[in-house]
Amino acid sequence: MKISKTVKRILDNYESDSPGTKANLARILMNGKLGGTGKIVILPVDQGFEHGPARSFAANNAAYDPHYHFQLAIDAGLNAYAAPLGMIEAGAGTFAGAIPTILKVNSANSLATNKDQAVTGSVMDALRLGCSAIGFTIYPGADEQFGMMEEIRELAEEAKSVGLAVVMWSYPRGGKLDKAGETALDICAYACHMAALLGAHIIKVKPPTDVLWQPEAKAVYEKQKVDISTQAKRIQHVVQAAFIGRRIVVFSGGEAKDTEGLYKEVRALRDGGANGSIIGRNTFQRPREEALALLDSIIKIYQGKE
C-alpha cells in the first residue's frame, strides 16, 4: 500500500503508536475515493441497536441485510464501514479484505431509560474479524460517564497493544444537559477534547450550533472574542479542541435530512477543516442508487469539486 504525503503527516501526529496501529489508520485513510487526501467518509450501521430495526431499515427493506451495507460502502468508495458485532460477523467472510472495518464494541438501545451503553464486543472479536479499529461511544454529561470513560481506557489500551486503532463517538447527553446543550458549541468542543484526552485516534462528534451552554464557558468565548458566526468557524473551533487538529475529527450526519441541507452541512465541515463524515441514516434509508449518488456528491465536496 502506497501512503501519500498527506497521510504520512497525519500519522506523524500519533507519536506513541506502534507500526501496527499506524498501519491500520493508514488502511482507513488510504482506502476508497478519498484515499490519500486526509479526508474520510465512513458508513456506520449501529442504528438497529440504538433505535430498533423498523425505525432504522423499514424505509429501505434491502437494508435489513448486513451484506447490503458492506456492498454499499464498497461501491460508494468509502474509507471504512463501522457496525456492531453481529453485523460484521454476518459479512466477514464474504467481504474479507474488501474494505476496512470498525467494530463498534458498545451499544445502547431505545428501551433503556438511563444514558449508558453496554459493552457488546471485544478487542479479540475485532482481531478475529480482521477489523482495523474498535469504536466506542461515551456520553459526556451522563450520570454513567465516568464508568464509560474507564471502560474505553481499558479497551483502548488493549486495542493499541495489538495494533488496532480507536474510534470514539463522543456524544454529550444526560445529566444536567438539555437538548440545546447536547449540540452547543462549547459542549461539543469539550466532548471532542475529552475523547482526545482519552486516547482516541479518530473522534466523532455532532456538528455544533451557535449555542453557548455553560455560563462560565460563554463568558470566556465572549471575552476572547472567539468567532462562532458561521458553521465553518464553529467546526474549526471543535477541530482546534482535538489538539489543534493533531487528532482526526469527523462529524455525524444525524437524522435523515433533505439533500441540499446535507450538502450545505458537508461544505461547512470541509471549510472548517473537518477530516470528514460518518454518515449512516442519511444514506442507507434511501434507495441504493440515490444513496450512491449522494455519497459520490459528498466525496466530491471533500475533494473540492462541488
Which ranges hold each PLM region?
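Conserved residues at beta->alpha junctions
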Residues: 253
